[in-house]
């Protein structure tokens, strides 16, 4: 929607998808799959009218790996996210909230790290952070998204709503279609139908409200 109307939109992808093997694609885990996923991300950005994506290249499903060094690899991700934001100087950053949409561990962790960058003061001054959400009244009877449960955000927190039209919908479906190593056409149609049900013409967001608002608990 915004890209079509002249706004500069940049998609930043934290992980490289190398472990996301799908039987139908016949691509083994590793470098070959990571390369395909990178090409798919570029294809998807083009369909959306966005700038070429920024690929941070962290190993898929590796953000939650235990390390003898506290904070690794999330500290490295935090540093890269802060550097990327300060290079791009966006007005708005969109990411997953604490629930990660449908609970994906990398989605949860990336959203947490982005929030950490903001609350530490490392994000550019004036940049605002929003989390995409699913309203409870839509999740109650929602179709399964890739066979998984989606997690709601309370309606009163979803204070920003961005409407989309048929042109936006068509662009989003073409963008989804770029990710052929991740899902079959039938699976893509199923997931797109789920998102259509969950959002029903407008995407809701919760704004991060960082900063002190009260000096006492009571």
State each model region's role:
Residues 1-88, 116-123:
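Active-site rim/loop-helix segments in enzyme catalytic domains that contact anionic ligands
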Residues 66-218:
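Metal-dependent de-N-acetylase/amidase catalytic core
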């Amino acid at each position: 929607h915004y890209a079509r109307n002249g706004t500069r939109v940049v998609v930043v992808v934290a992980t490289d998808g190398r472990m996301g093997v799908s039987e139908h694609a016949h691509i083994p885990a590793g470098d070959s799959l990571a390369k395909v996923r990178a090409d798919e991300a570029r294809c998807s950005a083009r369909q959306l009218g966005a700038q070429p994506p920024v690929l941070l290249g962290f190993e898929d499903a590796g953000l939650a790996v235990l390390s003898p060094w506290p904070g690794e690899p999330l500290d490295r991700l935090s540093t890269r996210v802060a550097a990327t934001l300060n290079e791009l100087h966006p007005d708005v950053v969109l990411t997953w909230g604490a629930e990660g949409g449908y609970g994906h561990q990398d989605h949860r962790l990336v959203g947490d790290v982005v929030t950490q960058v903001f609350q530490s003061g490392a994000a550019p001054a004036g940049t605002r952070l929003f989390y995409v959400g699913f309203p409870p009244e839509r999740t109650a009877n929602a179709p399964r998204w890739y066979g998984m449960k989606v997690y709601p955000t309370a309606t009163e927190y979803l204070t920003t709503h961005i409407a989309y039209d048929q042109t936006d919908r068509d662009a989003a479906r073409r963008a989804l279609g770029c990710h052929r190593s991740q899902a079959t056409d039938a699976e893509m149609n199923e997931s797109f139908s789920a998102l259509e049900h969950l959002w029903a013409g407008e995407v809701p967001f919760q704004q991060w409200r960082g900063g002190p608002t009260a000096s006492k608990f009571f």
